[in-house]
């Protein structure tokens, strides 16, 4: 009788141990599945913006207002400029973008709830522009960026800079299709010959060489 009782206790102990092992296994599997799900969601960040580190030789998108062009105390002409850039994404990162991922922009994070890749390379995020989402397009360098209607980039301010104006500076204004191209020189900013100060990152760029502005271009925008 004692032997029977002993074997019964042993069997119960073993069964209890097996049950605990099974429960532990189930918990482990649940945690692992959750971890895998979390890892599957990727955050896509814009490429680092180096504009402010390359002001001596660059093409810059700018804005300026009346009075921002002047002659300083040393007799050199300067321009006080506001500089702009836009979010750019690596093509490899975008090629792996999927529903559920997070796209990081300069304004915050966007969860990708819908993704539609077009044959022309355009990618519609969350329905695209027509459904309050946005469009990503690529350029000749292979990077992707957000594009609005009429191919307008989503510019945002990144800083301010004062840059010297070259004595050989020329400003080409083609913003009025009826007037055609108008050419201005440095002094035109100082004597009031330049009267239209609608300079925005959408229509105005400058070219800087060796730390001096040698050209400004303002183009027509619809």
Where are these regions (language model features)?
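Solvent-exposed hydroxyl-ligand-binding patches built from regularly spaced Ser/Thr
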Residues: 31-222
């Amino acid at each position: 009788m004692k032997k029977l009782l002993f074997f019964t206790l042993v069997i119960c102990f073993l069964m209890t141990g097996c049950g605990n092992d099974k429960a532990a296994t189930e918990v482990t599997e649940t945690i692992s599945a959750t971890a895998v799900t979390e890892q599957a969601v990727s955050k896509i960040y814009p490429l680092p913006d180096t504009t402010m580190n390359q002001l001596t030789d660059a093409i810059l998108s700018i804005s300026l207002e009346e009075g921002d062009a002047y002659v300083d105390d040393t007799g050199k002409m300067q321009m006080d400029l506001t500089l702009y850039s836009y979010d750019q994404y690596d093509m490899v990162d975008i090629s792996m973008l999927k529903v559920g991922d997070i796209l990081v922009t300069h304004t915050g994070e966007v969860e990708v709830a819908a993704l539609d890749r077009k044959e022309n390379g355009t990618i519609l995020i969350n329905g695209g522009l027509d459904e309050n989402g946005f469009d990503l397009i690529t350029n000749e360098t292979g990077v992707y960026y957000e594009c609005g209607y009429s191919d307008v980039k989503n510019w945002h301010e990144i800083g301010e800079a004062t840059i010297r104006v070259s004595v050989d500076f020329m400003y080409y204004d083609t913003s009025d299709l009826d007037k055609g191209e108008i050419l201005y020189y440095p002094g035109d900013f100082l004597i009031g010959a330049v009267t239209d100060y609608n300079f925005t990152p959408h229509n105005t760029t400058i070219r800087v060489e060796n730390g001096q502005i040698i050209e400004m271009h303002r183009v027509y925008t619809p």
